[in-house]
Amino acid sequence: MAGTYSSGASIGIRGSKVENVITGLAHTGVCVPDCAAAVEFYRDVLGLRVLSPPYVMGGNAIRNDMGELVPDPTMKAAIVGLPDDGDHVLEVIEYLNVHGGDQRSAAALTDYGLSHVGLICEDLDATRAELERKGVQFLVSGIADVARVRTTWFVDPWGVVFILVEKSRPERPYFCQWD
């Protein structure tokens, strides 16, 4: 169930900072029916590194963390990402005792909730061609150029939507490519 929030204040974009609340992004969780198969896809097709191989999490600690969210939160989980990205990783989760569903088949990119995961590459043409050779399904027919950022969209075998981003100015964050 979604909550509501209203501060009654306008939101400033640049220069605003709320102290001691959020200090960084931790990870993006991806729920899959087979953790090992998903790790193979992210490693062999996308080239991500396995930073923590699949392991089973169960018992009181995980029940205390997630027991109100999932009837039996026992899971097999792994972490994939890039070695120098710190906490910016994908947490790959397979719930072992609760059957999930393919909600993505009925979802649209514009639905509320998690929309997509952004990945950066140095050569979008070469990366897209390589992923197409590996059988990745792209959602758009080509490559767009928007605000000095080149993009293309694809989906993984479990319906998670990804955007590939090539920055024109690698030294800047992707959202600060324009002047």
Feature-to-residue mapping (PLM):
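Protein kinase-like catalytic core scaffold
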Residues: H88-E91, G113
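Long, charged/polar, surface-exposed segments that mediate recognition or autoinhibition
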Residues: S105-T110
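Vicinal oxygen chelate
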Residues: M1-V21, V30, P53, L90, ...
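A short acidic, glycine-rich active-site loop
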Residues: K76, H116-G118
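Short, solvent-exposed beta-strand edge segments and adjacent coil->beta transition regions
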Residues: T23-H27, D111-H116
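Core segments of cupin and vicinal oxygen chelate
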Residues: C31-D87, A126, R133, D145, ...
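Short, solvent-exposed aromatic-acidic interface loops
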Residues: Y95-V98
